[in-house]
């Protein structure tokens, strides 16, 4: 879980667009964020296994 101050700083508008970066919308994790869902890999897996992400299925081949 990201520190509260880091999340608040991330939410503020940036002076330059190039300084913006992705964070997970649930836990605030800055790494391994899937842009399409706005979630980190940990939260994505958790929600997908619970069936809360429509159209996402576990792969099997």
UniProtKB/Swiss-Prot annotation:
One GO BP: translation
SUPFAM superfamilies in UniProt: Glucocorticoid receptor-like (DNA-binding domain) (SSF57716)
Q: Record-annotated residues binding Zn(2+)?
A: 24, 27, 40, 43
Matches recorded under PROSITE patterns: RIBOSOMAL_S14 (PS00527)
What cellular component GO annotations does this protein have?
cytoplasm; small ribosomal subunit
Instruction: Please verify whether the record's keywords include Ribosomal protein.
Output: yes
Q: What's a Gene Ontology MF term here?
A: zinc ion binding
According to its UniProt record, which cofactors does this protein need?
Zn(2+)
Which InterPro entries does this chain map to? Ribosomal_uS14, Ribosomal_uS14_bact, Ribosomal_uS14_CS, Ribosomal_uS14_sf
State the free-text cofactor note: Binds 1 zinc ion per subunit.
Sorted UniProt keywords: Metal-binding, Ribonucleoprotein, Ribosomal protein, RNA-binding, rRNA-binding, Zinc
User: What binding partners and quaternary form does the record give?
Assistant: Part of the 30S ribosomal subunit. Contacts proteins S3 and S10.
Report the protein's function.
Answer: Binds 16S rRNA, required for the assembly of 30S particles and may also be responsible for determining the conformation of the 16S rRNA at the A site.
For this chain, the family text in UniProt reads: Belongs to the universal ribosomal protein uS14 family. Zinc-binding uS14 subfamily.
Q: What is this protein called?
A: Small ribosomal subunit protein uS14
